Amino acid sequence: AVPPRYGYTRG
């Protein structure tokens, strides 16, 4: 599984 990137859960 990949970690939440910058624009993934931020917007």
UniProtKB/Swiss-Prot annotation:
- GO cellular component, as recorded: extracellular region
Which keywords belong to this entry?
Cell wall, Secreted
Location within or outside the cell = Secreted, Cell wall
Secreted found in the keyword field = yes
Q: What is this protein called?
A: 68 kDa cell wall protein
Organism, per UniProt? Arabidopsis thaliana (Mouse-ear cress)
